[in-house]
């Protein structure tokens, strides 16, 4: 059995944006569907994405079943929690893929805790953060803090971005996440492969990270690998991401190429 955990790059979002949209908000009957009917459509699209994701294509290549737990927009802390909560389902010899996302989606310990009740994230990724002049907050935050408090926070966020932000904070957090999961997978006796979706988890090799099972550690991400082919057909069509700086997801063909690459890597380290 294959189990995969990660963000939208693992879940399969964008494998065929036109089809996905035609079954969701772009469906001619979407506005008159009941909630149950909309949920049926969402489940249909989720199955389509999972089938065509690198997990699904890898599983078919070696002829075993798979369970894709990828979740669009999640953080690396979410991925850690999902793995540990689901881990009782792992059997010895199972394969586990972990597609890490941007560190900037993790909760920050030195910001007020109620921010995270509104799904607050520093930024979707590093490329987007570099263009921010202040941090973005959800209007729902006003349910927890006054306008005066938020006025201060937005002003402080300008100072934070120019004077306080330091990637080293995430290095230490990510180092611990990686090592915890590697030790857990060793304990569970599963065959795991880690990879980065579009931002690197860490910028150097720390003492206790076993890079043997980490695909192209600190060299390539899913996005950079797919983009290196200079083939637009390997990426989702443009115009669907909220920020222009957000790396585009792999298409069905992009996931196919990644699955083939991971198949070679898996055989190299486990056979």
Regions found by a protein language model. Give the residues of each.
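Serine-esterase "nucleophile elbow" of acetyl-processing enzymes
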Residues: 1-78, 88-89, 257
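Alpha-helical cap/lid subdomain in secreted, periplasmic
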Residues: 84-271
